[in-house]
Amino acid sequence: MSDIAIIDPHFHLWDLETNYYPWLSDGVKPSAFGDYTAINKTYLIEDFLADAKNQNLVKAVHLDVGFDPTNPAGETKWLQGVADKHGFPHGIVGYADFRKPDVGDLLDEHMQYANFRGIRQSMNFHTDGAKTYLNEPEVSRTPEWRQGFKELARRGLSYDLQLYYWQMEEFLELARDFPDVQIILNHTGMQVDGPSHFEGWRKAMKTLAQAPNVACKISGLGMGNWNWTSESIRPYVEEAIAAFGVDRAMFASNFPVDKLFSSYDAIWNAFKKITVGFSVSERSALFHDNAATFYRV
């Protein structure tokens, strides 16, 4: 099952000896994905490649992971050093807060590093304090945030969008207002509130998919289904592909966060099982080609 070439467009590294990550360095806190004590330890590129050794992993893209908020570009600098030494990661998505008036300067700082591709500012708003990433709703509709997002747009960078499904209409507006920005939805819309929310999530995915500049990473399914099986995640995988199409969807691991719930092999083998009836070209798109296109790797 390891023959399919894989680009993993969503993984994380952290070095707790060298860098500061508040959510890890300052102790475990309530989160959308439960108790993460098991991963609250240094996770380096050697660890990631060891976890992935049974898969035909050819490239990977690193996503920001709650690095020191006083020095967001420090994460990109550190990761570029890792890439220069080890060959991974091939793409780097950093952090910026678009509400800050000097965000353009930060973007320029990120762009000094060859593997930098874009920004993720997680926009999840939830009434459950453990699940919320922002302290107010509809931030993307504020003039300050929009002005900052224009700085990303004019630099030709991509935007990784993490949110909850009930926010998708808000971000359909954003996608339509910035049609030249490649937006990449994270974690299949991050449905973490149980099966009763499936239908609302499904409809919202179709809503967001109306914007042709939005693609979807099918990942993070363990965060809302801690004891998942390939059959329990199948409806989410199939509905995501139905909404976005084979050409705008891609599989990803979310490792090591999803290591809380399964192995690297279990994730990729589940995706392979679910797509066993797909054509060679469709599988190539989902496992490899789309990630190469959207992240320019």
Swiss-Prot record:
Source organism of the structure: Sinorhizobium fredii (strain NBRC 101917 / NGR234)
UniProt name for this protein: Uncharacterized protein y4mH
Lineage: Bacteria, Pseudomonadati, Pseudomonadota, Alphaproteobacteria, Hyphomicrobiales
SUPFAM superfamilies linked: Metallo-dependent hydrolases
GO MF, one annotated term: hydrolase activity
Record-stated family: Belongs to the metallo-dependent hydrolases superfamily.
Keywords: Plasmid
